[in-house]
């Protein structure tokens, strides 16, 4: 494969490679066979676990893992065929399976290896576009599209290598390698070898490295932006807890509380004033009564409410403590100065959240008309006191309003947008960023393993182009085998970087996956029977 030649002699018509027999002692052969067999077994088991995990665990059926599944298929082919055939070729020192088997093996080996590179390239572009174009690209990022990209990766790899490997001898008219050697015929020219190394390894690795650097920078930038967003949310939360500073105090007129009969007469007079607007005298008298009614019941609120975007939790709103002079009598002819405290709730109409507009106690008729309109509840604590207040000419007394803090649960119908929306959006961004970072970590591990395992062999390819005898045969074997080891490392990278893969591997290796599925089924059946 690497182009090395062996000294042969013929014994009874059968070629014997003395150099191959002398190169490796018995224990060396046993050691090489055991080590390579173990690595091959690990590669097969690891990549089969990836496939089974993808099959049995629905959480792993994501678009990104479809690419990992394709990579596992390529690695499985290498673990089953390439590793074992190449080990046999090394230990025997020559190819004994014939030229057709050699060409088929080389075609399968190079197509699978190039498919691994193409899959890594697709994964890198997928991660890059997911990070840099989250809105436009993710809408198109479907399993069907992933399947098309995977199919193209394998198709391109097949077109690049299979026809040239299988048909080269027919194009040039003869086989250009000896029958006991197994290597690609058209790579006997140093310039072609150099060009294929550049195209198959160095260019893809350079592109993947550039993409990963951009992915890393963009991920760090989004992490910083998320930290700034969380900081602004903390500032808003702190401002929300601060008490309102802007308070406007006004006063209102308080009249002696009338008896039940007097209130009924006032209401009748107020109602009659609306019906008799054409009579001048009656209208004047009714208007005076209505004015007394409205003046006595006029009240002004304070504008000490937090802004709408800060209404994430029930806030502490001002409650007005009103001083009210009561002249209610216990019996005819006898006044009572008894102090009484009463708490009432007044529903006042709100428009455009203008809390500075004066509100009114409404008559029953007006309240009925406003029943279907949006209102906000205010609580008033009426404290009856016997001290003197300023009395007006119509018997009403001017009373001050003193604000005090009292927790009030706002009516949900009066709230603006969902108060937890900002927090939910931040949490969603954080979850997306965590997933992106995990995917980037998986990509970085796979890319690093690929570069470490493939670089030595491709460096030797470049060196051999200019100096054919500078690379020892042992280094050729070791470098080529190291490329195969990449297929063993990839499943380990999945398990180390993805917790779901790791847990699924563990359950499958311990033969507990079926038990887990049964337990989950029994759990859901038990929950479905609950009332």
Swiss-Prot record:
Q: Where is the composition biased (Polar residues)?
A: 334-346
May I have one GO cellular component term? synapse
Q: Which organism is it from?
A: Rattus norvegicus (Rat)
Similarity remark: Belongs to the G-protein coupled receptor 1 family. Muscarinic acetylcholine receptor subfamily. CHRM5 sub-subfamily.
Q: Where in the cell is it found?
A: Cell membrane; Postsynaptic cell membrane
Q: What is the lineage of its organism?
A: Eukaryota, Metazoa, Chordata, Craniata, Vertebrata
Q: Which residue ranges does UniProt annotate as crossing the membrane? A: 29-52, 66-86, 104-125, 146-168, 191-213, 443-463, 478-497
Record topology, Cytoplasmic segments: 53-65, 126-145, 214-442, 498-531
Q: Which residues are glycosylated?
A: 7
* Disulphide connectivity of cysteines: 102-182
Residue numbers of Phosphothreonine PTMs: 500, 504
Per UniProt, the ranges with Low complexity bias are 267-287
Q: List the protein's name.
A: Muscarinic acetylcholine receptor M5
Task: Note the InterPro entries from the entry.
Answer: GPCR_Rhodpsn, GPCR_Rhodpsn_7TM, Musac_Ach_M5_rcpt, Musac_Ach_rcpt
Predominant cellular place of this UniProt entry's protein: membrane
